[in-house]
Amino acid sequence: MENNTNMFSGVKVIELANFIAAPAAGRFFADGGAEVIKIESPAGDPLRYTAPSEGRPLSQEENTTYDLENANKKAIVLNLKSEKGKKILHEMLAEADILLTNWRTKALVKQGLDYETLKEKYPKLVFAQITGYGEKGPDKDLPGFDYTAFFARGGVSGTLYEKGTVPPNVVPGLGDHQAGMFLAAGMAGALYKAKTTGQGDKVTVSLMHSAMYGLGIMIQAAQYKDHGLVYPINRNETPNPFIVSYKSKDDYFVQVCMPPYDVFYDRFMTALGREDLVGDERYNKIENLKDGRAKEVYSIIEQQMVTKTKDEWDNIFRDADIPFAIAQTWEDLLEDEQAWANDYLYKMKYPTGNERALVRLPVFFKEAGLPEYNQSPQIAENTVEVLKEMGYTEQEIEELEKDKDIMVRKEK
């Protein structure tokens, strides 16, 4: 039954996209009650087959990665190289509110699916596109993944690691999900405009820009070369040793975060068991942490932190109201009481008989309640259903399948 409290009830999204970033935006709309129809080639979205690189068994019946990006959607297969396949797509666009894509612009132009062409045919349509590097400039047509466009080109991998070592190990989706949520926000705004004015719009987000926005504070600070540090840095070179992680006795890292150093100084020294340093004018003002004194404070904290376990520091810092968190592993998160209490995770029962934890999208709406978490569709699972809803007869569908204009999923 349709939940009319869902903000996107009655909205139709055509998703011409693969991998993660754009589908993540589509998932946001699907969770919000929109009908999101994902169009794939006969080979399917490559994300269906990435399990080995993630340390999972390859199974289409239990595909946690694909479910994260494509739950609650419908999936059809169209041959967009055929005239009939293109015709079906345009019939869908005529009734759609949003076209969501991660195709590169030159490919869209080649297929007559670029914004300038479509806005003449469908003036109310919102055109949403994820790119690697933006719409302009010498690299606008380069292929873009979050490993390359977000982490590397966007300034993450070149700065956020210990000086003298190597860039951090990156994992799939971290940059894509940020860009996808940015795009979802833009899509919602453009949809509101289209619904109130009758005029669609083009919404674009790039992976490179998403990373730059996330790092914006430090990118801007890098202009002041005579005042700041040039990253990458060593851990003990931080200008504020109260915003660093420290190793505990049992080899966990404990992250503290006290940007107003002066305010927290006495409290933190007391919590650390260094009451002798409370009020010490050498260290109690951040403006005094020059000429090596920041490193001295770092060393003091480091020496104290290894004297107790993470659980001991957990109790001490909670009692002292120190902003901190234990650096958790993914395995830790799967057992995290706070995550389960807030429905950040969902237990999916798969046809394989296994029950797996899946991560929910990080936006909740009180009145709508938690969205259903329906397993992502198999390749071409909804081709017949969607075409019948469009008015195609069984005979016409059979002919389209015979001519390879579409693909229909066969029941096993």
UniProtKB/Swiss-Prot annotation:
EC class: transferase
Keywords: Transferase
GO biological process, one term: L-phenylalanine metabolic process
Annotated InterPro entries: CoA-transferase_III, CoA-Trfase_fam_III, CoA-Trfase_III_dom3_sf, CoA-Trfase_III_dom_1_sf
Pathway it works in: Amino-acid degradation; L-phenylalanine degradation
Pfam families referenced in this protein's UniProt entry, alphabetically: CoA_transf_3 (PF02515)
SUPFAM superfamilies: CoA-transferase family III (CaiB/BaiF)
Gene3D superfamilies registered for this protein in UniProt: Crotonobetainyl-coa:carnitine coa-transferase, domain 1, formyl-coa transferase, domain 3
Activity's thermal dependence: Optimum temperature is 50 degrees Celsius.
Residues annotated as binding CoA: N102
pH dependence (record): Optimum pH is between 7 and 8.
Catalytic residues in the record: D176 (nucleophile)
A single MF term (Gene Ontology): cinnamoyl-CoA:phenyllactate CoA-transferase activity
Catalytic activity: (E)-cinnamoyl-CoA + (R)-3-phenyllactate = (R)-3-phenyllactoyl-CoA + (E)-cinnamate
Segments traversing the membrane: none
Domain of life of the source: Bacteria
EC number: 2.8.3.17
Quaternary organization: Homodimer. Part of the heterotrimeric phenyllactate dehydratase complex FldABC, composed of (R)-phenyllactate CoA-transferase (FldA) and a heterodimeric (R)-phenyllactyl-CoA dehydratase (FldB and FldC).
Cited function: Component of the phenyllactate dehydratase complex FldABC that is involved in the fermentation of L-phenylalanine via a Stickland reaction. This complex catalyzes the reversible syn-dehydration of (R)-phenyllactate to (E)-cinnamate in two steps, a CoA-transfer from cinnamoyl-CoA to phenyllactate, catalyzed by FldA, followed by the dehydration of phenyllactyl-CoA to cinnamoyl-CoA, catalyzed by FldB and FldC. In vitro, FldA can use 3-phenylpropanoate as a better CoA-acceptor than phenyllactate.
UniProt family annotation: Belongs to the CoA-transferase III family.
Name of the protein in question: Cinnamoyl-CoA:phenyllactate CoA-transferase
Lineage: Bacteria, Bacillati, Bacillota, Clostridia, Eubacteriales
